[in-house]
């Protein structure tokens, strides 16, 4: 064959089926490549200003979680002690006292330019304005019954009125101030008084034996005379009234009312004459009124010497200390010291001495 024949000879041709299968393979490869590129996207390229741009062209924002700081548990403060609450407090209101009144806290009179004070709406307790803090925890014992009258002859110790609230509701006519004083004195000295009840004063025992031995001697000169025997019997208790511990030139009178709580207590009203049998104990004396014998506190009586007279105050009076006058309340017991001068007389209350008008005194 010549060169022309070789050049002009036809090229070998592939069948159509093989061509189509090759195209299908290319398409499949391209499809796989497109899915792979979607899965593996390149990270966003940073811009000149430092912001990252996503595939869509918008900026990408990053969210950072804040770290929670662990707070230290603070120690709880100690619990506060429970505050006392008064379930029945006083209901004080401003009050103008036309007549002089005593403060139930400090026992001073509300007079002169200080007539303005406080009065409880229910129990009618009178106090100064500056004394209100002392009765914040004091319970009010309610409205006073219509038949209740305060015994102003009793000593004024009103800083302790808690023990007498129940007694006042049960016995409407008892003085709360006096009940507090009486209960405190009796409970404080109860043990001493028990031992004292069994022991008798030897001098008093001798005085009791003397009348028994003197009875037959007194009956001899009056044989057959029954009146003489009665007189002798009447003289016998009079001999027992002699005070072995004191001189016979004086006697004792009750300043305040003392109400007996026990069987061996001596009950007496103010102004009663008392015969002292035993005064060996400083806190409890043994006395006699008529046929009654018992114990009582010595600060409830006053000694009256020969020539002195006992009076009862018929009207309250506010005295001027600058001129030696004394302030007394109604129904108070006093002892006269000296004679009258200018309508005034010198009196003694057991604690204070001063001048008092005779028009307001009644001799007992």
From Swiss-Prot:
CDD domains: C1_Stac3, SH3_Stac3_1, SH3_Stac_2. GO terms for cellular component: cytoplasmic side of plasma membrane; cytosol; nucleoplasm; synapse; T-tubule; voltage-gated calcium channel complex. It is linked to Congenital myopathy 13: An autosomal recessive disease characterized by congenital weakness and arthrogryposis, cleft palate, ptosis, short stature, kyphoscoliosis, talipes deformities, and susceptibility to malignant hyperthermia provoked by anesthesia. It is found in: Cytoplasm; Cell membrane, Sarcolemma; Cell membrane, Sarcolemma, T-tubule. Keywords: Cell membrane, Cytoplasm, Disease variant, Membrane, Metal-binding, Repeat, SH3 domain, Zinc, Zinc-finger. Required for normal excitation-contraction coupling in skeletal muscle and for normal muscle contraction in response to membrane depolarization. Required for normal Ca(2+) release from the sarcplasmic reticulum, which ultimately leads to muscle contraction. Probably functions via its effects on muscle calcium channels. Increases CACNA1S channel activity, in addition to its role in enhancing the expression of CACNA1S at the cell membrane. Has a redundant role in promoting the expression of the calcium channel CACNA1S at the cell membrane. Its main location: cytoplasm. Residues 1-89, 189-244 are annotated as: Disordered. Residues 247-306, 307-364 form the SH3 domain. Residues 64-78 have a biased composition (Acidic residues). It is a peripheral membrane protein. PROSITE patterns: SH3 (PS50002), ZF_DAG_PE_1 (PS00479), ZF_DAG_PE_2 (PS50081). PANTHER family: SH3 AND CYSTEINE-RICH DOMAIN-CONTAINING PROTEIN 3, STAC. GO terms for molecular function: identical protein binding; zinc ion binding. This is SH3 and cysteine-rich domain-containing protein 3.
